[in-house]
């Protein structure tokens, strides 16, 4: 199985473990800060005017941006295992920042909703390893890339009967 997967994409070796750990810690910090910023924007109607004009709250409120960030983290990792670790820790730290802000600043904690996102974050460990191979070569990499784009398009476009008038 290992030799078959290496025909799709071969893992990079040679990066020091301390650099890998430092990179993972930076990704976790970025995820935590992004979670806090997202909840701050979600929970506050009085945000700065430049953020209102960019409509950032609307973009970060959609699933497609998080799929894109997870895909980028996984595809640019050195190995499939590192892709899974970095992506799942990014999402778990983002959830931690988001719900710690909910609990300590806003005074509520939706536990069932939070547990759903935690389960999705754990699933991202395996999905990130799969996405890592999308940057490889051959028909399987093309199929994985097409699947990723298909999921992103399904999240981005409202494909209904009215959509058919736009595309012809």
Kindly label every feature range from the protein language model.
Residues 1-88:
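N-terminal topogenic module of multi-pass integral membrane proteins
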Residues 52-65, 110-120, 166-167:
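Structural signature of hydrophobic alpha-helical transmembrane segments
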């Amino acid at each position: 199985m290992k030799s078959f997967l290496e025909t799709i994409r071969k893992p990079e070796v040679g990066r020091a473990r301390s650099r890998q750990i430092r990179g993972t810690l930076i990704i976790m910090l970025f995820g935590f800060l992004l979670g806090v910023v997202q909840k701050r924007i979600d929970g506050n109607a009085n945000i700065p005017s430049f953020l209102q004009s960019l409509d950032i709250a609307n973009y970060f409120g959609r699933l497609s941006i998080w799929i894109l960030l997870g895909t980028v983290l996984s595809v640019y990792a050195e190995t499939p295992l590192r892709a899974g670790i970095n992506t799942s820790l990014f999402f778990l730290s983002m959830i931690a920042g988001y719900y710690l802000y909910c609990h300590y600043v806003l005074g509520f904690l939706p536990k069932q909703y939070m547990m759903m996102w935690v389960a999705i974050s754990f699933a991202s460990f395996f999905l990130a390893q799969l996405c890592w191979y999308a940057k490889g070569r051959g028909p399987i990499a093309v199929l994985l890339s097409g699947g990723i784009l298909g999921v992103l398009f399904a999240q981005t476009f409202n494909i209904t009967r009215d959509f058919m008038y736009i595309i012809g």
